[in-house]
Amino acid sequence: LVMDSENKSSSKALSTIKSLLFALIVALFIRYIFVQPFKIPSKSMYPTLMVGDQILVDRISYGVGLPCSKSKIIPSFKEIKRGDVVVFRYPKDLKSISCPNGGFVGLSSIYYIKRVVGVPGDIISIDLNDIYINGNLISKKIPKNYFLDGVKHNVYINIFDQGKTEVIYSGNGNLLGNIDSLVVPSESYFVLGDNRDNSMDSRFWGFVPRENIIGKAFLIH
């Protein structure tokens, strides 16, 4: 009777451990494949995102790809479009690696969050602080339908993940200067912070390669 009781206790404990391990694996799978949380440490996306806001990033809508390859582990079912707020690896990171077919992939934990304003094929023009996409002036006022779900205030950020925060640019940034017409290349995007006067974005370091984009921000909580 004593042995039988001990066996039942051991079996119950083992079952509990297995359940906890399974739950942990599922949580990690969701965390690294489906959604990822980030915390806003700066004001580059103000007034859409405020310092301290926590957001969730959809990692699968754009597909999950392989570095330096157009192949995808999970195929995309949504296109990256103008107005999307995206999180991406800093394209000029010193830890980036060159790809055999050209371009580069960021490897570090430095992430940025900005709004996509130019997609492949768009023509970008810059005249002082005025930016034109295909001849249309990009307003500094963010349209209401561009706000993220859950936003209760008018955005800026970049990111936080397991204690790692986005590095606010500390070097001497140089704007691209006035540009008559710059065509957004294939598999690349032109991004801006909503707080345009206080944002390091494509005006400073150029286009964001498709493979650097982690996902789309979809919820503030």
Task: Describe the residue ranges of each PLM region.
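Soluble "head" domains of membrane/secretory-pathway proteins
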Residues: 2-14, 29, 33-34, 38, ...
